[in-house]
A protein has these predicted regions:
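Conserved phosphotransfer microenvironments
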Residues: 11-19, 28, 33-88
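C-terminal output helix
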Residues: 103-112, 116
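Short hydrophobic beta-strand segments
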Residues: 1-15
Length: 126
């Protein structure tokens, strides 16, 4: 079981992360949430994987991804995007992997497991 930090600009006080990303809520991972701002950096200290919600605000998602990258945090970043958002995604975002917003729990879980296994080794998926 991994500890996931869900970072989203749709997370207001009291809104649970599984409300924003329902497929993640069906998994057995520990879920925590943070707003898509600099406070997410502090919250990331207790996480194994950071899940960034880029479905509705790509510019802010890119800023958050780059903020994590520039801060030196080496945790895997999993970016959730719409199919239309793929056109904007490129290497300078600093994400470890992406997933489309319509993906089900099995795909989320597989990607999380792969990110954790690559983070434990030399960066290659084992």
């Amino acid at each position: 079981m991994a500890s996931l930090l869900v970072v989203s600009n749709q997370l207001a006080d009291g809104v649970r992360p599984e409300t924003v990303l329902p497929a993640v809520g069906l998994l057995s991972h520990e879920l925590r949430s943070a707003p898509a701002d600099t406070s997410a950096l502090t919250e990331s200290a207790k996480a194994d994987v950071i899940v960034i919600d880029g479905r509705t605000d790509l510019a802010n998602a890119r800023m958050i991804c780059r903020l994590f990258l520039s801060s030196g945090i080496t945790l895997p970043l999993l970016l959730v995007v719409t199919e239309g958002g793929l056109a904007a995604l490129n290497g300078d975002w600093g994400v470890s992997d992406f997933i489309l917003d319509g993906a089900g729990p099995a795909e989320f879980d597989a990607r999380i497991r792969l990110l954790l296994s690559s983070n434990d080794s030399d960066g290659l998926i084992q």
